[in-house]
Amino acid sequence: MVMNRRATSLIKDQYYHLWIAASKDQLFFASDLDKAFFISLLQDCLSPRKRLSHRTTSDANYAAMIDLIAFSLTNFGVNLLVYAVSTTSVQAFGQQLLTRYASYVQAQKSWEVLPFDSIFVHDLLADEHEALAVSREIHLLHDDWEYDRYSSIGFYLHDRRGDWMQAWHLANLFHNDSLWYRQFMLDDSHIGVRQFEFIET
């Protein structure tokens, strides 16, 4: 099932919040190994080096179309913040992630109940300032938000690096100052500023 908030296929170069989850409150990740595999999917889809190297699969590489700005992997799903050239590329990217993860899960003997039918939702954001607020929301989904390895917080606070992540889109707003971003994370005045509104289309 694919959902979005508004018809935007002709709008170029926008920020999007993507959410991928199992339906009916099922687990999306059964273990940290599953989360690690999903991160490897993000790297494979978004690394420019993967795009330029010889590829052994027919899956598309989205490095030229999508910049990953922030991410969060919890037991119940995936939140991604991206900058993309079009809604069409966002839809194709989300579907590829979901399809490849479904194939991985179906091959795992550790799963008693598969987390599919799953849903993929994408929400067009107003601008980089709304994207900054969303980055805070998805990082705070983790109890140990400051150090959780399955979110992108390390790219903002601890100088974590990778060519598949493009945190500079937001870091430029606060001069790449990790102390500023940490204080931003701790500032409760941002709570409730934005609410997600997803409408099935």
Residue ranges and their predicted role:
Residues 1-158, 164, 184-201:
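Short catalytic/metal-binding and nucleic-acid-binding patches
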Residues 176-182:
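Short, highly charge-biased, low-complexity peptide segments
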